[in-house]
Design a protein with these regions (language model features):
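Pre-Walker A adenine-sensing motif
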Residues: 1-7
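Conserved, well-folded catalytic cores of nucleic-acid-processing
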Residues: 7, 34-38, 70-78, 95-99, ...
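Walker A/P-loop nucleotide-binding motif
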Residues: 10-30
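Short coil/turn segments at beta-strand junctions that form active-site/ligand-binding loops
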Residues: 12, 40, 104-105
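Walker A/P-loop
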Residues: 25-37, 44
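Conserved catalytic segments around the Walker B and adjacent sensor/switch elements
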Residues: 37-56
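The catalytic "switch" region of P-loop NTPases
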Residues: 53-55, 104-106, 126-185
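Mid-core helix/loop region of P-loop NTP-binding domains shared across ATPases and GTPases
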Residues: 60-123, 131-136, 175-180
């Protein structure tokens, strides 16, 4: 809990990994609720991942343009999203800078992150590196099953720059129903 909160408010890059049923989604819900109840000025961006899959044959992969659109739409509702990649990137940076200067922080949370394509993982590094002067504009929290840990392994040369910047926290599996109920309630 504390690690996720710290990541959200301090511009960190974090992956939360656990087996199905280990409480990952509950932790995400608690984070969003804690930020709201504490009155913290953190805008949480949660791209829709309803039909997300790693490849086209199994569903629709979540790509960098979709993430940029989600950030722009959440941080600056009603703002049009430019179709060209260059203009979209400029608009994204502009809305994050303006929002940051207005006193807000931003946290991108992606559930089912184990289904992210490697190209999208690489693009997340670029999102995370957006700054206004020395101030980082976006925290990133990836939430996924154990396959995400495999993707973020130091043996994955495709995403080594992401691996070097992303902290990975592994949730232990819930062994007893009582443990789960105590965690959940």
């Amino acid at each position: 809990r504390a690690t996720m909160h710290d990541a959200a408010v301090n511009g960190n890059f974090l992956a939360v990994v656990g087996e199905s049923g280990s409480g990952k989604s509950t932790l995400r819900e608690e984070l969003v609720e804690r930020l709201r109840l504490n009155g913290e000025s953190v805008i949480v961006v949660e791209p829709y991942t309803l039909s997300m899959a790693e490849s086209e044959k199994n569903g629709k992969p979540l790509r960098a343009p979709h993430i940029a659109e989600a950030i722009i739409s959440t941080v600056s509702p009603g703002t049009s999203v430019p179709p060209s990649p260059e203009m979209r990137a400029r608009k994204l940076h502009k809305v994050l800078v303006e929002s940051s200067r207005a006193g807000f922080r931003h946290c991108l949370v992606i559930e089912e992150a184990h289904d992210l394509h490697m190209h999208t993982l690489k693009a997340l590094k670029r999102f995370w590196e957006l700054k206004d002067g020395m101030r980082r504009l976006l925290s990133i929290i990836l939430i996924g099953q154990t396959e995400l840990k495999d993707k973020l392994s130091s043996t994955q040369s495709d995403v080594r720059e992401v691996v070097q910047r992303c902290d990975v926290v592994e949730l232990p599996p819930v062994k007893q129903p009582g443990d789960f109920l105590a965690f959940r309630f």
